[in-house]
Amino acid sequence: MKKDKNNESMKLKVIPIGGLGLIGMNMTAFEYNDSIVVVDCGLAFPENDMLGIDLVIPDVTYLKENIDKVKGFVFTHGHEDHIGALPYILKEVCVPLYGTKLTMGLIERKLTEHGMMRSTKRKVVRPGQSINLGEFRIEFIKTNHSIADAVALAIYSPAGIVVHTGDFKVDYTPVFGDAIDLQRFAEIGKKGVLALMCDSTNAERPGFSASERTVGRTFDNLFAEHSHNRIIIATFASNVDRVQQIINTADKYGRKVVVEGRSMVNIISTASELGYLNIPENTLIEVEQMKNYPDEKMVLITTGSQGESMAALSRMASNMHKKVSIKPGDTIIFSSNPIPGNEKAVSKVINELSMKGANVIFQDAHVSGHACQEEIKLIYSLVKPKYSIPVHGEYRHMKAQGKIAENLGIEKDNIFIMKAGDVLEMDANAAKVVGRVQVGSILVDGLGVGDVGNIVLRDRQHLAEDGIVIAVLTLEKYTGQILSGPDIVSRGFVYVREAEDLMEEARQVVEDSMEYCISHHITDWGKMKNSIRDSLGEFLWKRTKRRPMILPIIMEVE
C-alpha cells in the first residue's frame, strides 16, 4: 500500500457492481486515487421468465472504462455466485487473480475449460497473509462457510480500513481446518475500522447457525435407520465439508460411494487433489460398478438439490438418466434448503421421486453456511465500525442487518443500504453516496454474451405463451397481384388438423387485407405487413381470445 501525504485528504470509493438486492452476481469495486481492487466476480442464475438464458453476469462497463486503474480481482471463496462470471469478465478486464488454495483451484478448473489459463496471472494467498495492490493492502482472514478456504478481507487504504466478511458463519467445530479467526477481527477492530461490509443473507434469523458437524450426526442416524436401502443424497456440489461427512458415514457403514453430476465430479476431484477431501481407499467407485454391489452397500452423492431440470437427480426422477433408475425403497436425502424461487422445482422432483416409491427425506439434513443474527452482532462488536454497509442478500435482508447495526449503536446516518451502481465516498469524517455508475445484468445464452436483451426475452415469452402464426404469400412484382397463398403456418397456437376452418378463415382475412392494400395503392412492404398483422391479430383474438405472434412473409417474383 502506497502512502502519500497528498492523498490523505482523498476519499475511498465503494462501488457495488452487483450482488445487492438479489442472490448472486457478487462484485464490489474499491477505488482510491488511481487504484481499483475488485472483490469477487460472481454470476446469478436466470429467473423463470428468462427463457433460454443460461447465466446472468454483471455489467462491468465501469471497470472497462477504468481498466488502467484495476489492479486485480480478490476472492472471498469459491462459490459460483462469487467466481462464476470470471471466464466472461476476464475477456474484457484481464487482470491478476488472488484467492486461497481451494478457491484458486476451482477458478483454475474454470479457466482451463475456457482455454484461459496461459493468459491469466494468478496467486494463491493463505489466510493470515496480505497482498499489496496499488494504494491498497488486503489481508485475508480465516472464516467458516459452506465451502472450505473461505476468507474475510481487511482492505487497508489511506482513507481507513474496510472489513468485508464475504459469506461467513461462526463455526467453532468445523469439519475441515480451523475455526473463524475471531481474534484477528478483534485486533483489527482495535486499530479502528472505517466500515464493515457484512453478510446479510440470514440477518432475519435469530440466534446462531448450527455447526456443520451436526449434519454428520444426522447422516449417522439416517444411515443406521435406512440400513437396508440404497441411499441417494443430493447436496450442493461446492459443499466440500458436507461431501466429506457423507463419505465418512458411508465408510463407517461399509458402503461404496458413487458421485453423479458433472459439477459434483469436478469439485470433488479438485478438492481431493488439493487435500481438502480425505477419501478412504476403494470407497469411490464408478457408476457402472454399482451392479456389483447390493443396494444396502451403496450411496450416491448427486447434484440436483435445487430441482434443476438437467441435474442428475432430476434426470433420475424423470427416467431420463442413462445409468441410474430410482427403485421402490430407495432413500433420497435432500441435504439442502431450496434457494428462494426454486421451491416449485424442488417440490416437483420430490413428488416424482415419491411416485416411484422412494422414501424422500428433506428435513434436518442441512445447516446454513451464513451467519444468523447473533453471529452478525458478534462481528460488529469485535470490529466496531464507524459505518455499516450490509451486503449479500435481498433488500429485506440488508434492511434487517441495518436494523441490527442501529441497535448496536451505529448512527442511522452511518448505515448505508446501497444499490448496485451506487458510489459511496467515505473517510474518517464523513460518508455519502455521491452518484452512480452504469451497472446491470448481462445475459448469457449459449455462446452469446449480452446479445439477448429485453426485447428478445419478451418475444420468447410471447412465443411461449401464445405461439406463432406465419402468413406466407407471393406477389407479382409489377402488379402486386397475389400469385400464390396466403398459406398459414401455426406453431404452439392451435393444432392445425383440428382447426382447419379457423385456418381457412385466417387465409381469407389475409387475402382481404392484401386486396385492400392493392386497391388503395399501398406498395410499401412494411405497411402491407402491418396491415396483415393488425387484421389477422384482431380476427384471431375475436375467435380464440389469444394473441399469437404474427409473422407475415411476403415474397416477390417477376
Named regions from a protein language model:
Residues 205-335, 339-522, 529, 534:
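Hard-cation-handling environments
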Residues 2-74, 79-292, 311-325, 344-347:
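His/Asp/Glu-rich metal-coordinating catalytic cores
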Residues 20, 44-48, 52, 69-70, ...:
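A glycine- and charged-residue-rich anion-binding loop/surface
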Residues 111, 405, 540:
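Conserved hydrophobic residues forming the short capping helix/wall of the S-adenosyl-L-methionine
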Residues 22, 147, 294, 463-465, ...:
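Solvent-exposed loop and beta-edge segments used for protein-protein assembly and interaction
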Residues 521-558:
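C-terminal tails and terminal domains of large nucleic-acid-associated
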Residues 14, 122-124, 195-197, 332, ...:
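Conserved beta-strand scaffold positions in the cores of enzyme catalytic domains, especially
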Residues 96, 389, 551-552:
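Short glycine-rich phosphate-binding loop at a beta-alpha junction
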